[in-house]
């Protein structure tokens, strides 16, 4: 019975982890959340938007924390992180994935040259405690780089 239930949940794009169920997020969901965040910065200003992005119970943390907005500046300093407030104020410029890839540097470079983009890297999925590929969409707004990622 349990295997049939898990199979049925998998068919509907859901994850079951430690007794919790939620719909798996898509790259389109991540991009839409970044677009919504960019609109808030433009409409309300940087300070108000950053406060909202850092609100772990706010509109920019979704699907039980699977989707959240993070913001870095051009130097790699974290200005907002809806999932981990301990990162705010920390410089993540030299952060690498398990394969040694400097994915934050890549985001900064692409944002500076193209204004927006995607980057893929391996990261620990806290929900499953496994290393997985993650794809992050980001956009540059003034001196901010606003991003949101999903596990593949």
Which positions does each model-derived feature cover?
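N-terminal membrane-sensor/transducer module of prokaryotic signaling receptors
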Residues: 2-152
């Amino acid at each position: 019975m349990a295997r049939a239930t898990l199979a049925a949940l998998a068919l509907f794009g859901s994850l079951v982890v430690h007794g919790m169920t939620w719909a798996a997020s898509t790259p389109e969901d991540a991009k839409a959340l970044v677009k919504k965040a960019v609109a808030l910065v433009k409409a309300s200003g940087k300070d108000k938007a950053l406060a909202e992005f850092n609100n772990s119970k706010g509109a920019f943390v979704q699907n039980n924390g699977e989707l959240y907005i993070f913001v870095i500046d051009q130097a790699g300093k974290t200005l907002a992180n809806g999932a981990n407030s301990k990162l705010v104020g920390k410089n993540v410029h030299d952060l690498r994935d398990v394969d040694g890839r400097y994915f934050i540097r890549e985001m900064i470079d692409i944002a500076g040259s193209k204004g927006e983009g995607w980057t893929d890297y391996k990261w620990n999925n806290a929900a499953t405690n496994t290393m997985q590929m993650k794809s992050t969409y980001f956009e540059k707004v003034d001196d901010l780089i606003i991003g949101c990622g999903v596990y593949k």
